[in-house]
Each structure stands twice: as structure tokens, then as C-alpha cells.
Amino acid sequence: MVRIAIAGAAGRMGRNLVKAAHHNSEASVGAGSERPESSLVGVDVGELCGEGRFDVALVDDLSKAVEEFDVIVDFTAPVSTLANIELCKRHGKKLIIGTTGFSEEEKLVIDAASKEMAIVMAPNYSVGVNLVFKLLEKAAKVMGDYCDVEIVEAHHRHKVDAPSGTAIGMGEAIAGAMGNELNDVAVWSREGITGERTKDEIGFATIRAGDIIGEHTAMFADIGERVEITHKATDRMTFANGAIKAAVWLNDKPAGFYTMTDVLGLNDL
């Protein structure tokens, strides 16, 4: 049984992660944390999520419950995730990172940490999205040289980063399959007189509205036809279940940097 700590357990995603861990036969909820200023600190994590009493009180710092978990699942914010990396390094814990919006420098910190600890990091933990990444690699190898590639993503009004980590992951899959670095070919937005698009660019468009959980479309557009590969999430539990699956998988792995491709065994597709 893998004992899991949920960072940000009182948030929308955090509560779903608690539920997913509780209902996974190979996992249990060992700890949950929330910001120190939260009025929910001290509340039972299970009761908070409507799952009954777990006898696990929400703490303001996971270091206070370090003996109660094996793996942290973190879908919070970069500064909090980086702090949890240091905690994991000190205490021999493992980490699932679902946080997005890291700077390039912060990504280097995560990569360096993976030499000392086991990390799974993915822009999206749903099985469907990770299959889409593989499909995009295949499509890019066939159509990328002659099609215009555009990525459109939509999320709820509360999402604070753009484009989404999943959209960036889609772009990285396409660019990598074509032998490019995404930062060299990405056009993150367009406004005003932009001139004609260049052959290699990958365009991004972002929508923020209402309660959209997450919708992503990659478009390969040629003259006379267009191929679109789309994923639509209708319930956050799909992300939560995937993250807990990753935590169970990671528990017996050595130090290293892993992705959902590793967790799901998609490397040979």
C-alpha cells in the first residue's frame, strides 16, 4: 500500500486527488496540506472531501507529517512544488508533479533534483491526453512538413497560466517529431498586422471562460483538407486517477525523471 500526501488538498484538484487515492486499492491517504493561512488547517482530510473521517488532519507544511507518506502528489504552484522537492530530497520521498507554469530555470532545478530522487512530471495525467501526445508525434512525422500546425486550448476562467501545460506538451510532441525545439518555432499569440505565417511555426490560441475543465485541439491544415486531433475532459477525476496511478507506479522506482509515457508504457507505440 502506497501512502500518499496530497499538497493543496483543500483545492478543487486536491479534493479530487484525495478521493482518487482513497478509492485506489493500492493507495491510501497519509497526509494532506494547505496554505498556512487557510482556515481549513486541522480539518480531517476525508471529511473535507466528503469521504468520511480518515483521522488525517490537514497540515500547513508536509514536513510535519513526513513519517506518514511515501509519495507527494503536487498540483499546486511552482514555488510550493519547489519547496516540496527540497522536502523530498531531505527525507527520501518521491514526487508526482502536476503543477504547470514553471520557468526554464525552475525546470532545470527539477531536472537536477531527479538525479537524487524519483520524480514523475507531466503536463497532463489523463490516459487519453498522453495517448494524444503519441498520436501527434505520428501525425507530425507524416503531415508536419507540408501542413500548417495550430493548437487551440480552452479552460475555466480561474486558470492562471497560458497556454496550458498540456498545450505546450502537444507542441513539444509535434516539434520534437519534426526535429525542432518548440521555443524556436512557437508563436504563442497573434495580434495586429502579423504578416503571413511561416512554414515551420506552431501557433497557439487560448480561451479562458466559464467552467471548461480542459479542451485541446491540434490542427494539421493543408489546402483542401484538415486533420484535427482533439481531447476534451469532462471530469477532473480523470486527471486525479492518472496521478494516483503514477504515484503507485513510482513508489518502487529508483531516482530519475519519469513521465506518463513511462507510467503507461507508451514508449513502444
Curated annotation (Swiss-Prot):
UniProt superkingdom: Bacteria
Cytoplasm recorded as keyword: yes
Location(s) in or outside the cell: Cytoplasm
Signal peptide: none
Pathway: Amino-acid biosynthesis; L-lysine biosynthesis via DAP pathway; (S)-tetrahydrodipicolinate from L-aspartate: step 4/4
Alphabetized UniProt keyword annotations: Amino-acid biosynthesis, Cytoplasm, Diaminopimelate biosynthesis, Lysine biosynthesis, NAD, NADP, Oxidoreductase
Residues the record lists as binding NAD(+): G8, A9, A10, G11, R12, M13, E34, G98, T99, T100, A122, P123, N124, Y125
Active-site residue numbers: H155 (proton donor/acceptor), K159 (proton donor)
GO biological processes: diaminopimelate biosynthetic process; lysine biosynthetic process via diaminopimelate
Single Gene Ontology MF annotation: NADP binding
Residues that hold NADP(+) according to the record: R35
SUPFAM superfamilies xrefs: Glyceraldehyde-3-phosphate dehydrogenase-like, C-terminal domain, NAD(P)-binding Rossmann-fold domains
Family annotation (Pfam families): DapB_C (PF05173), DapB_N (PF01113)
Swiss-Prot/TrEMBL catalytic activity: (S)-2,3,4,5-tetrahydrodipicolinate + NAD(+) + H2O = (2S,4S)-4-hydroxy-2,3,4,5-tetrahydrodipicolinate + NADH + H(+); (S)-2,3,4,5-tetrahydrodipicolinate + NADP(+) + H2O = (2S,4S)-4-hydroxy-2,3,4,5-tetrahydrodipicolinate + NADPH + H(+)
Enzyme Commission number(s) from the entry: 1.17.1.8
Gene Ontology cellular component list: cytosol
Binding site residues for (S)-2,3,4,5-tetrahydrodipicolinate: H156, G165, T166
Family to which this protein belongs: Belongs to the DapB family.
Function field: Catalyzes the conversion of 4-hydroxy-tetrahydrodipicolinate (HTPA) to tetrahydrodipicolinate.
NCBIfam families in UniProt: dapB (TIGR00036)
This protein's name: 4-hydroxy-tetrahydrodipicolinate reductase
Natural source organism: Vibrio atlanticus (strain LGP32) (Vibrio splendidus (strain Mel32))
Taxonomic lineage from the root: Bacteria, Pseudomonadati, Pseudomonadota, Gammaproteobacteria, Vibrionales
